UniProtKB/Swiss-Prot annotation:
One of its GO terms (cellular component) is extracellular space. It comes from Rattus norvegicus (Rat). The gene is Afp. Cu cation binds at H28. The modification Phosphoserine is found at S113, S119, S346, S446. Disulfide bonds join C101-C116, C115-C126, C150-C195, C194-C203, C226-C272, C271-C279, C291-C305, C304-C315, C386-C395, C418-C464, C463-C474, C487-C503, C502-C513, C540-C585, C584-C593. GO terms for molecular function: metal ion binding. This is Alpha-fetoprotein.
Amino acid sequence: MKQPATMKWSASISFLLLLNFAEPRVLHTNEFGIESTLDSSQCPTEKNMFNVATIVVAQFVQDATKAEVNKMSSDALAAMKENTGDGCLENQLSVFLDEICHETELSNKYGFSGCCNQSGVERHQCLLARKKTAPDSVPPFHFPETAESCPAYEENRAMSINTFIYDVSKRNPFLYAPTILYLAAQYDKAVPACCKADNMEECFQTKRASMAKELREGSMLNEHVCAVIRKFGSRNLQAVLIIKLSQKFPKANITEIRKLALDVAHIHEQCCHGNAMECLQDGESVMTHMCSQQEILSSKTAECCKLPTIELGYCIIHAENGDKPEGLTLNPSEFLGDRNFAQFSSEEKLLFMASFLHEYSRNHPNLPVSVILKTAKSYQEILEKCSQSETPSKCQDNMEEELQKHIQESQALAKQSCNLYQKLGPYYLQNLFLIGYTRKAPQLTSAELIDLTGKMVSIASTCCQLSEEKRSACGEGLADIYIGHLCLRHEANPVNSGINHCCSSSYSNRRLCITSFLRDETYVPPPFSEDKFIFHKDLCQAQGRALQTMKQELLINLVKQKPEMTEEQHAAVTADFSGLLEKCCKDQDQEACFAKEGPKLISKTREALGV
């Protein structure tokens, strides 16, 4: 079954588009001494070095011009070669940061001299903290126009592609380097094909739309993963990866899964730290390892492993989950056996829970990550409690029922959301979400609330197309990303204590916490302002989405004035507003009609709502 596009990118949360470099230099182990598969001592190839350097510099110095980025990139590569003779350094990123800070004129010009006055980890963290998605100083990204693309590409293909990489990187500072190079490869295919097409403009339009979607979704996903790592740490990331890898490769044993989880976690961390070279090098190594271990991992990646490196990672990520081994079952109440959980050391408990995550995940390939994390937490709590009981086996009698509660809650939410989507349609479902989220976070602007709830509706439109068994994982995966971005918004500009609690307490419980958080009880509505409820004839000219947005802004302002507004009151106000539109838009002097009838509607609404 072909997955919808949005389903695909939500599934990618635990992987990368890993491609385009030779094998890495560093052998690393985790806290239990589990060895990495990243054990080669080879150095990076020359292939794409300048493009990768462009990514690093443009993402750290987003305001820099193309010429400035070119100079810093060239100087950094020259320094690497001068220091080693072959460009192979243990810490390549530090060379780039040295070069960025060496340009004192630029550090003063773009306001990061304070970071450059620091050293080591502090300097790195300071520069990372300056990264901003869509900063005001950088205009929005637009794919090159048709008239520009063909002559520029024909004149200098390499420069055309590098300019594309620069433009994407500076506007998407959290987008992983492999993803940027993958998009650049798509651009490299699209331009010559469209320049020769009979309908050039239509060809470019189609290609641009597809690439823009991948760019937008990839950037959001990568920023989300980096924020989760920063907030909840490496151990949380490894737990997520054990789940996803166990679902994808159910034949693999726990030792192989732990190694892969360690390596993929390391890659995510390097990508998030802006270390594009190691991100790429280690990425290819992991994909190469996966292809060499198909017998113990999955045969579903066989066709992927025939592809060029540039396409290999994308293909493996989106390949179907492997087939479950015959006879694979799990009885949680018997998994511990006759061992005493209370006598385990902290390290033994972590390893045991990793094994449980592995077994539970490969037995439940369609469950959401968050549900499995919550199930594992409940399982551990039951083991802790029952290990203190005089009759441990009897204490565990209701274990299966307790663990099922998390699955049932998620599936019930998916069913309820899909039923509402089918009953109300996207516009009225969004209005329902708008009322709910305005009550939760009235401090958000109308534009932010409309954007967030629009994304929530897109979850239903995407996931409700799937079979029932896949809806929950699809919905929870996308909700995790969108709620994650609400938490990023809170991090940048605090919303309220309720949102803070949900964003800070538990990664696996964020969605449920936000769902259960009904209203910000600390919110005090502002004094009523008629300026927010002035109507003009432009309402009559507005059509489609523009008219819907105007109505939704009115709805948001009403809820901010009266958070406890009932459904009946909302329906009455909506009917009155529709009546105003119908009356005044038919009037010969529309503006005069709105000036006369608008205040009457406002007075009636204020009286009905008691504001």
